[in-house]
């Protein structure tokens, strides 16, 4: 059984990824291009030009897991202007999986408690 509760780091590979790549090819992208190491606390997301499907690469402690999601309709709101790895918050990851942009203009910023007069 896959246990994603240990994931703390949600990375997306901005720009386009060749979706023909499988586990070994995506591991090479993570390690050689982005100089990152796969572990049980990180998941790496990749998206192709069509933006209707993503691949997620994860290390579960015993081997690599490759997840694939294809939308029936619509497209993912994927950052295209950068060729780097971007770290997402858990909330940004949820937004992405729900089809929203990871940059929400109307989201409330975390604040500090005020004083009552």
Positions of the model-derived regions?
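Polybasic/polar functional segments that serve as interface/processing modules
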Residues: 1-117
């Amino acid at each position: 059984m896959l246990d994603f509760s240990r994931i703390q780091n949600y990375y997306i590979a901005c720009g386009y990824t060749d979706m023909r790549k499988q586990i070994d090819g995506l591991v090479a992208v993570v390690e050689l291009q982005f100089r990152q190491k796969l572990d049980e606390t990180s998941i790496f997301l990749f998206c192709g030009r069509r933006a209707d499907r993503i691949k997620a690469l994860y290390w579960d402690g015993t081997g690599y897991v490759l997840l694939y999601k294809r939308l029936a309709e619509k497209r993912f709101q994927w950052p295209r202007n950068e060729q780097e790895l971007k770290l997402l918050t858990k909330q940004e990851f949820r937004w992405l999986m729900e089809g929203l942009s990871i940059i929400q203009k109307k989201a409330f910023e975390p604040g500090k408690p005020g004083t009552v007069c």
